[in-house]
């Protein structure tokens, strides 16, 4: 049986540890667009835009705009809310 990459990825991202590592890897790229694209995938896998927006106390439109790789420039407060809504949190480590 063949499975599409996106389907496989979305299934894997349902696991919190995998999702955290996925976001950490995306954060290694110096381009914030990479992180926003990865976070968008995590949101999709862990409930979808509507549910995550509701849990984060954001409108769906605001969440879409926030995670837009073209225009997105989320605040720390918004990123924290989105991560919390997906069951994740920020972390910092030494280089």
Residue spans for each PLM region:
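Conserved interaction-surface patches within small, structured recognition/assembly domains
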Residues: 40-41, 65-69
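Membrane-interface junctions
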Residues: 28-29, 45, 69
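N-terminal flexible/basic segments that precede or flank functional cores
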Residues: 1-41
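Long, contiguous binding/interaction regions
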Residues: 57, 81, 95
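DNA major-groove recognition helix of helix-turn-helix/homeodomain DNA-binding modules
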Residues: 76-92
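Short alpha-helical DNA-recognition segment
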Residues: 45-65
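Short, solvent-exposed alpha-helical "recognition" segments
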Residues: 70-76
């Amino acid at each position: 049986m063949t499975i599409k990459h996106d389907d496989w990825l979305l299934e894997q991202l349902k696991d919190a540890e995998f999702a955290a590592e996925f976001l950490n890897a995306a954060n290694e790229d110096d381009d914030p667009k990479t992180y926003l694209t990865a976070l968008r995938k995590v949101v999709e896998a862990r409930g979808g835009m509507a549910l995550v927006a509701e849990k984060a106390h954001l409108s769906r439109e605001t969440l879409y705009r926030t995670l837009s790789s073209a225009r997105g420039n989320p605040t720390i407060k918004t990123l924290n809310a989105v991560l919390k809504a997906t069951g994740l949190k920020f972390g910092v480590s030494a280089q």
